[in-house]
Amino acid sequence: MDVNSRLSVQSNVESPLMHEGPEPQQITSSAAGNLAGSITACKKVLRSNSLLESTDYWLQNQRTPCQIGFVEDESENCASVCFVNLDVNKDACITENLQQKLVNVSPDLPNLISSMNVQQPKENEIVLLSGLASGNPQADFDVSQCPWLPDICLVQCARGNRPNSTNCIIFEINKFLIGLEVVQERQLHLETNVLKLEDDTNCSLSSIEEDFLTASEHLEEEIEVDDCRSGLENTNVSANVLESKKPKETTQEGWDYHKEKLHCALGEKHIRKHRTPSTKTEGSKENTEENTSLKSLNRLVRPSHLKSEVAGNKQLATNYSYPENIKGELETSQMLFIPRDAYLSMVKKDVLSPCSVLSEQGGSHRDHDVTPNPLPPVQNGEASTGEYATNLAESVMQDAFIRLSQSQPTLPQESAVSFSMRSALLPSGCCTKDMVVPRSWNELPKIVIVQSPDGSDTVPEPNVSSWPDMEFVETSGIFSADSSSRPTQSALEVALACAATVIGTISSPQATERFAMEQESLVSTYAQRGTGVQQTQVPQAFMAPSTTEYSFPSALCGMTQVASAVAVCGLCEKEEATCPVAPTDLLPTSGASEEISSIGSLVMERSTELGKEAIAEALLREATLILARPDAYSSLGELLESVNQRIIETTSKTQTLCTESVQRNELAHTLSNVILKHSVDELHQKTTMAHPTDERHPCGTLDTLMESVNQLLHNVICFTFKKMNHIVTLSEHPSFDQAAGQAWVKAFACPSSQPLSNAHGTGLVIRNLVEDASPKSNKGGARPELVNNPRLQSEFSCSHRMFDSTAKSFPKEIYLKGIMGEDTRNPHHTLNYDSNERRASTDLGKLTTASEGCSGFQETEDSIVPNTQEKYICATPLNNEAQVNLSLLGDDLSVPAQSTLEAKQSEVYGITDFAEELAETVVSMATEIAAICLDNSNGKQPWFCAWKRGNEFLTAPNGSCRSLKRKKENSSAGSTVRKHKPPRLSEIKRKADEHPELKEKLMNRVMDESMNLEDIPDSVSTFANEVAAKIMNLTEFSMVDGVWQGQSCSRTRLLGGDRWNRLKASSCESIPEEDSEARVFVNSLGLMSTLSQPVSRASSVSKQSSCESITDEFSRFMVKQMENEGRGFELLLDYYAGKNASSIMSSAMQQACQKNDHLNVRPSCPSKQSSTESITEEFYRYMLRDIAKESKDGASSRRSSHDWTTGLLSPSTRSPLCYRQSSMPDSRSPCSRLTVNAPVKANSLDGFAQNCPQDSVNVQPVSRASSSGLCKSDSCLYRRSGTDQITNMLIHETWASSIEALMRKNKIIADDSEAANASPGPVSSGSPLQVEKNANRLATSKGHRGPTLLVQESVDYQRKDAVTEGNHSPVSSPGKTAPVKKPSDFDPRRETSACHNAAGLNSPRRSLCSRDVPLIQIETDQKEECIGEPGPFLSQSGSLEETEGHQPEETIPDVARNEDTAPSTCQSSRDSLETSGEVEVEVLKEDIPRDESRNPPSSSEESTGSWSQLANEEDIPDDTSSFLQLSERSMSNGNSSGTSSLGIMDLDIYQESIPSSPMINELVEEKEILKEQSESIKEHASGLPGRAASPQRSLLVINFDLEPECPDAELRATLQWIAASELGIPTIYFKKSQESRIEKFLDVVKLVQQKSWKVGDIFHAVVQYCKLHAEQKERTPSLFDWLLELG
């Protein structure tokens, strides 16, 4: 077989996406060249002269069939390939139904197929497509849920109904071979690229700060590289896609221009990347062609997602889907307004400059171009981690630049430009465009300006192509405008300087100096130059704050916040979709949206002139006119002229309001986006249904859209006033009414400076406004009636604006408070609004949250600092911290989430999802911001000091951000990162004693001298508190890693900056606190107070530096340590002492938990955090004393204690897995209690190992809800971390040199000889490593079986397979291969063996029997081993069940199904096991088939604390410094079964076991298992682990048929099985939903295994069947039935 032709849509614009010709052009570019940067099509023609084509080859094939697995549709942990069968009846080929089916697979497909003429490939042809966007999530085809699908989609012509000749079968096999092989190779390529890129940039994506820092470090190289790579590639891709539809020259120009532009607008891309999701739902149904072009963008976006894919596939999926949707939306708008060519250009323009497209299309589109700009960023954003970092940096730059540049009033110029734009004057057009559509930070072009401050470059760019010029013009216009006027130039320079500062390079020192000096002048100038209405307004809003309190540090912090928020939103699947940052994107997506955005800008302008009711009315009229009648003006110039005239007339009169316009602008954009999105969605649905293949929507579409939009706007206004009334009513600020007027004025005067105060002030104002305007607004939002209160009227007239202005002071808070807050308080309210409204509000909330979360949040913080200083109403927010938190944080985030949740019940719209996303976004943002601030390298500085200080600490923000970089502890530039030495217990005690007040105020957090309680809380700290409070408010929706909140600087100090950085989020667990008022204290983030039951923390430190025994106090101390340090104490111990320390800690934690019922201890968290040995030693001493004391109590205890100590082996080799901690776990357990998941047993460590049946392990089921789902924070990209050799060495060295000796000396661990004696029998055969691994695995799997399992029960006799695999006792010391391990002679089938099976839990029960390892150790082992050795076990449960292939598969599925609920799993697994009829072993009361004795999947997880974050060893060695604890969700519940926890992780290993056996009933070759233990050990240890390590090697095969009846699904699945076996793929998975006869298939697989069939045998059987089928046709049974009969 060779490649006849290869069609590859490369980043190169030149390469046509698809040629119309009969055969695709041969392009040599490699399909995997770009990281999913383009659609690649490769047609392969099978030649009959290939070895693989010969029948003999297949008949004699002796390969062993690979394993078969079935996964739930949601599974997304392994590479996947979709075989799309294009066989259809000729007459049905063109039907819309088929087209829609293709669209469901991928919107790109129909266009690709038609353009490539592969509608009906020949039998020997196969077309490989990669880079496609995923299909419509709503479609009945589930593939869209698979993030991998978009990555690799194989379109092939199946045999279908054609004769089942041998040649046909071979062709099919070969096609499957090609598809699977390509997927494998591509996966490896992507894997390497992603890893390499991330390694290069040190981007673990663990935190925004890190990314940000990385970006600053690599900005210069990466901007160019990324611009070229991602910008060009992405652009090219989009261009290519468009290209097929539009003349190449134009595309090329546009793209070239865009490339430059993208280069400048990486940040924008980033933002857009996030925004794009907003349009997600709209475009999915768009025309396929348009979708295709958009998808190209999506593909571009995908790379970044690929990066994040490491973190979680779901994100990818989301990303894929949303870019498509966006594209669809864009296409739709374009379609609505533009002919195809125009549309193409528009898309390009969108990518390049929506404005140009708009100009091309008409005035209405002009605004749109801004939105399109975000799309290109999306494209660029996808490229690589490095690119991601760069994008982040650029995004920050852009924000700074936009803030500054937009502040410059260029409105007059803008209008002029608009005319010229219309006239096709590029330079003026550019200016005009920018001015016309100041898209707040959506306008990346400004970044371009950053590159060329003069703006001259920008102007020329627009010239490149007329339509792109428009957008560019806009950019240039801004630049040129800036350049034209000195103040403007200064603003630009300031922006550049700001951006440069963020990036770490200030090109113009003068600019920096001038920045502060000119800020005020610029602001005033801008205000005066109100002409810049939209732009000016936005900039002014920013400028005002900057002038008052704007400093580079604060700017940087704000930008960082924005960037982090954006990144967070973008990285989160849902967040991306929600990210309002892309509101413009939404707008650009549709012409209507464009119009709206322009209108929005106009509205913003109006808002600038809030004082003038006439202007507001005029603008609204203009907007309505524009939206409704794009042709009302012959050209944009006319429209702009009329609008500009009105605006200019009032500009001078509304200088004060100019600043507000920025925020209002953003709000307006957000609202317009929401509205447009909703309208466009409806329109799309209608048009798609009516004219699925029509590229252009019917003329009526615009009217319909207009009508819908107007209705929504009207509703918005009405609801806005209603909500305002509610807000006012609900807000508990009686004094606000009086201060309302003043506050309002202040808000306008210093909108940015008093965000917090305005939160309340705004509320007051709002109340007044509501009182004045609500009656009128109720009337349909009649603006005229608002005239009475001109400011309010204008503002209210534009509800977005109103929110903006309110939001401006406190944009997000008030806005959300109004929308969400009201809803939260009056859920029914939300429900009352029509679904459209609700949806709009939800979206709006989302957008607001996202965009404002970025800009608003930033603004809030920036302004907060000023605000407090300004002493506006800051006090009120502080006093009403809860209120503020709610409004600022809660309403913004949690409240919206809540309201959405409430709405969700009554609405179809995924309000729940939105709420979750919102909560996640908020939490992530808050966490990141807090982390940035917390990790402030200037040790003594309070939390957010960097923001507050101003220019003197120009580098501080960078420094603090840098310190966050997890990989580079000392990378903070210029800032000294103190290495904090964890205090000894004595120190902690001493300090605690010295500062008794700390115990109360700081919730008894142990403080070190660096903490200065005296520091007066500044606005920044206030903000931090509020953030914490807000996060706390979100706990219901997501258990926030609250620790960081609770963590004050002291904690940072205590843990040490680097460690804190790593721990900050994941370690955070909401811990119940006694003081509900804790939030009041500035230094305590107030996290704890919101939690439920109090944790007894009063006696925070033991009174004696050395404890005589593990007293209650000490236990409490340990618990507190864990709470305060995110389980850090245990982590520290674990780091040095390995599993033993961890085990001991578990015991200690159990004891502590016993005393604190509300605490559920889950200490098992591998971590690389550094610590001092002293703590470990001291702790061991306590342990030893306690043990000694216990030993005196009685013979039994003595004996047990002896057994226990004997069983204590040195820690088994730490699994080399790194757990990437996330700043925000994706799913947080809704329960507010700290879940420390340790086996809760207790009286003594020793007792834990005692052999009393009563010693049941109490694993309290804490909510497992959080156990699935990856973190969605940008900072929490979970990386499958690779082995960190250095870390391992360090651990083992430490162990060997100190801890081991210490323990041996104290008899904590037995000598080898003792251990050997202890072990009942020799270690089973197998390499020591394997044995050790197996033992570990066993230990892991032996975790507790159920929420309350008898210890002995927990012992799972590993299913035979597991046992045989590693008969060794689970515990294995690194040095000793498990001397004490379970005897090799242990026969899982022997009942007595139960005793011997020192598997651990069991042995504790019968300590007299071989007392292998103390339960504690096993517990630890389980955790680590489980993680480390998932391969062999596949997932504890999954592999167990799988390995237990002997057991009827049916049983296993049942067990697996229950896996999610550990307890039920145990039961069901037990039952099913019993049913299996395996030999039963009598374990206490229950008889469990030995086979089955292997733990149900959940058991190990329960004990291990659901290691959802298992990392793959091989994946990322570079994350050495970040062994992070599993985030809350993974830790959510010890109970969560392996599947749920595993499911969370990307662990492909677990993918197999994820749903546990039920999901993936993996058939392990029983014969192998039964034959040789050692052999099976090798196979499983090597094969499975290998698979685990590189899950990409396992593939998910998705089959999609245009006509489901057409192909023989069973035959096809069998052939795919053969192909996968030929390729050596360890396991191939099929989607359960697509395989109707799973049981039959499993039976066939079992049969094949029993008969030891090879691939040749299967092939032979298939050939025989095909012959039989050809002869008997109708009477032939199905293949599976026939095979089973044959067997």
Curated annotation (Swiss-Prot):
Basic and acidic residues composition bias: residue spans: 1382-1393, 1482-1494
Region (PKA-RII subunit binding domain): 914-931
Composition skew (Polar residues), residue ranges: 1-14, 1366-1375, 1461-1470
Extent of Low complexity compositional bias: 1495-1508
Alphabetical UniProt keywords: Cytoplasm, Phosphoprotein
UniProt keyword Cytoplasm present: yes
Location of the region described as Disordered in the Swiss-Prot/TrEMBL record: 1-25, 272-293, 964-989, 1363-1406, 1421-1520
Disulphide bonds in the chain: none
Free-text note on domains in this protein's UniProt record: RII-binding site, predicted to form an amphipathic helix, could participate in protein-protein interactions with a complementary surface on the R-subunit dimer.
Function: Anchoring protein that binds preferentially to the type I regulatory subunit of c-AMP-dependent protein kinase (PKA type I) and targets it to distinct subcellular compartments. May act as a converging factor linking cAMP and sphingosine signaling pathways. Plays a regulatory role in the modulation of SPHK1.
Family to which the UniProt record says this protein belongs: Belongs to the AKAP110 family.
Protein name (Swiss-Prot/TrEMBL): A-kinase anchor protein SPHKAP
